[in-house]
Amino acid sequence: MSVESFTPTALEFTPNAAHKVKTLVDEEGNDRLKLRVFVTGGGCSGFQYGFTFDEDVADDDTIVEREGVSLVVDPMSFQYLAGAEVDYQEGLEGSRFVIKNPNASTTCGCGSSFSI
């Protein structure tokens, strides 16, 4: 039996997303806040993305830092998000954080639900 090392594919945190997180953190006046991205069961395609601000980081969380702010992902969610890009977009449909996920085989029209 052999042991193989596993290096997870990075999660990309775009400058647009980092800038928006920084703006929101500054508005709250709490520099301990981090953007937590997670995956839960549900939505029209089986899984859905969620975003929240969190002060706490668990020992097994993945942390991605850019421009002085942090994005945090728990290990269960990371397996679905490895290689994905977290971005922030503004357009006619409004403004929101979006995930471009190469692991998703299908996504719903709103972009917040996916299947593998």
UniProtKB/Swiss-Prot annotation:
Iron-sulfur: present as a keyword of the record?
A: yes
Disulfide connectivity for this sequence is none
The annotation note on the cofactor reads: Binds 1 iron-sulfur cluster per subunit.
**Which residues of this UniProt protein bind iron-sulfur cluster?**
44, 108, 110
For this chain's UniProt record, which GO biological process terms are given? iron-sulfur cluster assembly
Recite the UniProt keywords alphabetically. Answer: Iron, Iron-sulfur, Metal-binding
The GO terms this record gives for MF are: 2 iron, 2 sulfur cluster binding; 4 iron, 4 sulfur cluster binding; iron ion binding
Q: Which Pfam families match?
A: Fe-S_biosyn
Q: Which PROSITE patterns match?
A: HESB (PS01152)
Q: Which SUPFAM superfamilies does the UniProt record give? A: HesB-like domain
Q: Which family does it belong to?
A: Belongs to the HesB/IscA family.
UniProt-listed HAMAP family: Fe_S_insert_ErpA
Assembly, in brief, is: Homodimer.
Functionally, this protein is described as follows:
Required for insertion of 4Fe-4S clusters for at least IspG.
Protein name (Swiss-Prot/TrEMBL): Iron-sulfur cluster insertion protein ErpA
Naturally occurring in which organism (per UniProt): Pseudomonas syringae pv. tomato (strain ATCC BAA-871 / DC3000)
The beginning of the lineage is: Bacteria, Pseudomonadati, Pseudomonadota, Gammaproteobacteria, Pseudomonadales
